[in-house]
Regions:
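Residues embedded in well-ordered beta-strands within globular domains across many folds
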Residues: 102-103, 150, 183
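Conserved beta-strand-loop-alpha-helix junction that forms the acyl-donor binding cleft
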Residues: 123-126, 150-161, 177-179
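Acetyl-CoA-dependent GNAT
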Residues: 2-13, 18-22, 26-126, 135-137, ...
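Conserved GNAT acetyl-CoA-binding A-motif
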Residues: 135, 142-154
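Conserved active-site alpha-helix within GNAT-family acetyltransferase domains
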Residues: 132, 155-173
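Glycine-rich phosphate-binding loop
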Residues: 129
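Active-site/acyl-donor-binding loops of N-acyltransferases
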Residues: 175-185
Length: 188
């Protein structure tokens, strides 16, 4: 029998949890603190792409800007209520831990495209299938209205490139010097 890890239910999801349908909800300006806490728990991402960790004020401005663009969506990825890990904060609206953040824009760069600007999973949850489930869920939700999804990979990030390739995306655009796009046709 497998020993439980610090995340408890993540290692052995509850029978009621559907691992293929992660719970997401739109983020609003009141959620900027949750997004910032996620960033603080995942500093290696910002180190890898060689940018300073955004301040809480910068995160608030970014979330507000996204809410003013009808094509752009920032969603909180919410985990199983039983998940526990250092730095994992809870969403007061749902009483679920914030497992990640998804930022995407519809009809960009072309009509019928969707571009994932950021999929960031909490450091303690990386490598456990959370990101793959989020991507599969987004593909399902956009399948009837989107022909192609592009995923932005910033900096020299071989683990992100490998992640997207594993999800069936292929290298599509070198927007260098620090940006590559991976793409997947999904329909429409």
């Amino acid at each position: 029998m497998r020993e439980p890890d610090a995340l408890g239910a993540l290692a052995t999801p509850s029978a009621s949890a559907d691992p293929l349908a992660p719970l997401t909800r739109p983020a609003d300006v009141h959620d900027a603190g949750l997004v910032h806490a996620l960033y603080l728990a995942t500093p290696s991402y910002f180190e890898m792409i060689a940018i300073p960790l955004p301040t809480s004020s910068e995160v608030r401005t970014e979330v507000l800007a996204a809410r003013q663009d009808p094509r752009r969506h920032i969603e909180l990825v919410l985990g199983d209520p039983a998940w526990r890990a250092p730095g994992l904060v809870r969403d007061a609206r749902t009483d679920r831990p914030v497992a990640g953040v998804l930022d995407y824009k519809l009809d960009y760069p072309e009509p019928g495209d969707a571009t994932i600007n950021l999929l960031l999973v909490h450091g303690a949850l990386q490598g456990r299938g959370v990101g793959a489930r989020v991507v599969a869920d987004l593909e399902r939700r956009l399948g009837g209205s989107t022909r192609r999804i592009l995923a932005a990979v910033y900096g020299r990030n071989p683990s992100a490139s490998g992640f997207w390739e594993h999800q069936g995306y292929h290298f599509a655009i070198d927007a260098g010097p620090v940006l590559d796009w991976y793409a997947k046709e999904i329909g429409a």
